[in-house]
């Protein structure tokens, strides 16, 4: 069996970057992936302006004059248009253009009125103090955002500050989803004896919505090979990606692998991880296939660890963005952790700082692949290496805090 890292490397190496793009206004670009490099068309700020409410004057005059004549005011959007001469100053507001001749701003708290139009200063600022220079934030022609960057509440306002109203983004992925099994009942329907609710399709839909995918829902497939083949063919024609839940184990009614081999290609089938061993990756023509396990915890863990970076690659996110989807920290185990040697284990945990400021983590609930309730009280995965056995409280372990997908 492949390790998780081997599976990720093989999968990401096969998946192509997208080619389809569209141009959209900024207000429609949240969580989209940029399809072009963006260079600044202007300097930001585009003019020297004041960082403080205060007075603008000539730095050289501070050693020549005891007090200064106030000759006008400069407001943001309504600048002073004259020229400052020796012994003069201009009342200036934050963000206002620096008047011609001025090269320092003294904040108003360091000024004292000595007459109706005269000010004395009790400060010795440096040349250029409290002045924001042209291009100090962004210089004209500088690379602002690289192709493959995710557009969000940090990057979109930056583009707006440059006056950029439209950008080219990669088209949204069309993702088909379905669940398999005669035992499944749609959420909201009456539950018959021996049936369970289709939690996984509901969960996958939520995750795909957060990833800004276009979702094609093929509902629940009964255990019928002919129906599998028909639905897989329809999904292949309509989508970029097909994600199934269930049907990837070794039971008599698990038809997914057989149909995938008939219509397409199985790239790998099992991974040495727990939960999530029966995970499938393959192709149906131009459509990429991901087969999640039927157990709810296994399905969510494999989606998070494998499908999430795969969809990011297919959506156009750059390599650094994909690497940043997960991050690992070292914490001290606050509880004993049960672990068998052989597979990498992702246990649900809760990390926190103790009274001494140490990063601690404790296991949350039962760790079975069918125990979904533990996720609700968790904020991280406790990642235990394949060769590691039981962990005793006090030992160091690796944790992986949940990213925004699970928050």
Where are these regions (language model features)?
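Short glycine-rich, flexible loops that bind phosphorylated cofactors or substrates
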Residues: 99, 153, 250-252, 298, ...
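Flexible glycine/proline-rich
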Residues: 22-27, 36, 77, 138, ...
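Solvent-exposed alpha-helices and their adjacent loops that cap or buttress functional pockets
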Residues: 48-50, 61-63, 81-85, 98, ...
């Amino acid at each position: 069996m492949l390790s998780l890292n081997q599976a990720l490397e093989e999968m990401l190496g096969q998946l192509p970057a997208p080619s389809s793009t569209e141009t959209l206004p900024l207000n429609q670009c949240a969580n989209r992936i940029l399809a072009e490099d963006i260079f600044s068309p202007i300097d930001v700020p585009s003019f020297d302006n004041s960082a403080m409410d205060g007075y603008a004057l000539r730095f050289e005059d501070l050693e020549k004059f005891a007090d200064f004549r106030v000759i006008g005011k400069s407001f943001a959007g309504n600048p002073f248009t004259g020229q400052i001469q020796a012994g003069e100053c201009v009342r200036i507001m934050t963000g206002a253009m620096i008047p011609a001749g001025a090269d320092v701003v003294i904040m108003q708290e360091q000024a004292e009125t000595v007459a109706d139009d005269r000010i004395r200063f009790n400060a010795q600022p440096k040349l250029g103090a409290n002045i924001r220079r042209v291009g100090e934030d962004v210089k004209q022609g500088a690379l602002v955002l690289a192709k493959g960057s995710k557009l969000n509440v940090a990057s979109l306002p930056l583009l707006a500050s440059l006056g950029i109203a439209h950008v080219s983004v990669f088209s949204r992925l069309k993702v088909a989803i379905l669940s398999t099994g005669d035992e499944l009942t749609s959420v909201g329907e009456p539950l018959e004896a021996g049936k369970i609710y289709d939690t996984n399709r509901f969960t996958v839909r939520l995750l795909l919505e957060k990833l800004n995918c276009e979702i094609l829902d093929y509902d629940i497939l009964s255990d019928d090979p002919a129906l599998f083949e028909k639905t897989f063919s329809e999904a292949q024609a309509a989508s970029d990606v097909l994600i199934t839940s269930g049907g990837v184990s070794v039971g008599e009614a698990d038809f997914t692998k057989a149909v995938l081999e008939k219509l397409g290609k199985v790239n790998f089938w099992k991974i040495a991880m727990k939960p999530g061993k029966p995970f499938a990756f393959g192709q149906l023509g131009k459509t990429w296939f991901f087969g999640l396990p039927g157990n709810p915890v296994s399905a969510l863990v494999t989606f998070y660890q494998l499908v999430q970076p795969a969809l990011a690659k297919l959506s156009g996110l750059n390599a650094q963005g994909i690497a940043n989807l997960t991050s690992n920290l070292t914490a001290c185990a606050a509880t004993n952790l049960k672990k068998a040697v052989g597979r990498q284990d992702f246990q649900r945990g809760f990390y926190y700082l103790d009274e001494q400021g140490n990063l601690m983590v404790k296991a949350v609930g039962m760790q079975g692949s069918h125990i979904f309730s533990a996720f609700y009280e968790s904020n991280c995965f406790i990642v235990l290496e394949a060769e590691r056995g039981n962990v005793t409280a006090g030992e160091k372990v690796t944790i992986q805090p949940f990213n925004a997908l699970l928050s």
